[in-house]
């Protein structure tokens, strides 16, 4: 296939137009008064969203050079979402500013490699400064404030704080859809284990890359399933029952996986396979925990039980199974006396444990079994409102977990302003071009504050000037339009979210400024005279 190549300034200009197309769309959502973006859906009603990564994911530009620039910024948002669960809009705004400043330096004659060195140095320094400023999250009020700031709703903040109080900071919290208008919290029996689907072809929801099974049968075994023939008899019974099946096994051969996937895709039966969590003896115990929760008979090698002899009575039941790439959550709505007995056995084993390793494993299993699963059931008047609310709650939940991991810093962009003040005169290099790279990052730290103020209807420049005059932890409350003690007002951000936003924005910016050529494929019978002056 033929290629078309752009060089130097022309290539950078095209990439920058793509960067601006995506960043200008995403940044309108930043802050407590950020606006929404409406997204066309091919086979569904339009979605109205406030989530940076969800917006960025949907943007495809006709011009391939611009599209490359847009996709690189989407990667910033996506990486930030993967690592911190929130902060995607902040990361996008920072990336746009850094790329603009970096390209300006290169176009003025600076050496891209040295500028890149300065960007990387500054980003790492900013990340360290943020960690040094971080305040540990202990109080219930802090958890509520983080969730409220992320979601833009005090009600959501309260619900997430209550959920964490009930199942613990490390407990399992899932977001589900309610049939009513109200958003409610419910705690049910369940557990989560650290293994996801054995093949991505089991996924039913491509957008979230998850699969959910309702009222499912459960097969729990420490056997390695080597041939399809071993499980054909029980699969035939499952097909007759017309119910989905979750298989939790030590391992499943690729040939067997292929057959199961093919049958699922054909609609013969609904099945998902996950490998067993843990290793060795601990794996057997965890499988027995799953069997007790689901009321399944644990099909054990040690007891010489064979997969070919399985009957329907050997399978367990679960109200809902949510299977993701790296974990599986099992939810049961019924109380089980066997589960209570299992919990008591674990408590006794903890008392009698002879090593720290054994105690730790037993405590982890006990926490998983006894903590239950908190379900946040999202209610709304319309499907469009429901989707938006669900996204906000998921972001807020991720932000709260990030805050528990690394702590919190002052919000409203003030933490980055304070780091700017600390570094603008102290982070210096003898090399002029490395210094230009440092300035690319340090000067960009003021941009989130500017954008938050602008979206709230204030002069971004004036607010930034005032922010620089405020004492430590004091800053602009964009919702109320006044300067306050941000910590007292509960305007806080998770350190991990802010830190990852800076690191990921700097990473892509450092790579983009070293670009001297852009190559795209020419499609046959298409008009390839792209207009670089427009964004399509």
Curated annotation (Swiss-Prot):
MF terms in GO: ATP binding; ATP-dependent protein folding chaperone; isomerase activity; unfolded protein binding
SUPFAM superfamilies in alphabetical order: GroEL apical domain-like (SSF52029), GroEL equatorial domain-like (SSF48592), GroEL-intermediate domain like (SSF54849)
Say where the protein is mainly found. Answer: cytoplasm
> InterPro entries, per this entry?
Cpn60/GroEL, Cpn60/GroEL/TCP-1, GroEL-like_apical_dom_sf, GROEL-like_equatorial_sf, TCP-1-like_intermed_sf
Top-level taxon of the source organism: Bacteria
Keyword set, alphabetical order: ATP-binding, Chaperone, Cytoplasm, Isomerase, Nucleotide-binding
Q: What is its EC number?
A: 5.6.1.7
Q: Which Gene3D superfamilies match?
A: GroEL, GroEL-like equatorial domain, TCP-1-like chaperonin intermediate domain
Task: Give the catalysed reaction(s), semicolon-separated.
Answer: ATP + H2O + a folded polypeptide = ADP + phosphate + an unfolded polypeptide
Sequence positions that bind ATP:
29-32, 86-90, 412, 493
* Broad class of enzyme this protein falls into: isomerase
Where it sits in the cell: the answer is: Cytoplasm
Tell me yes or no: is Membrane among this UniProt entry's keywords: no
Q: Name one GO cellular component term.
A: cytoplasm
Biological process, per Gene Ontology:
protein refolding
- Assembly: Forms a cylinder of 14 subunits composed of two heptameric rings stacked back-to-back. Interacts with the co-chaperonin GroES.
Question: What's this protein's function?
Answer: Together with its co-chaperonin GroES, plays an essential role in assisting protein folding. The GroEL-GroES system forms a nano-cage that allows encapsulation of the non-native substrate proteins and provides a physical environment optimized to promote and accelerate protein folding.
Task: Please report which protein family the annotation says this sequence is part of.
Answer: Belongs to the chaperonin (HSP60) family.
Q: What is this protein called?
A: Chaperonin GroEL
Q: Which organism is it from?
A: Onion yellows phytoplasma (strain OY-M)
| Native organism taxonomy | Bacteria, Bacillati, Mycoplasmatota, Mollicutes, Acholeplasmatales
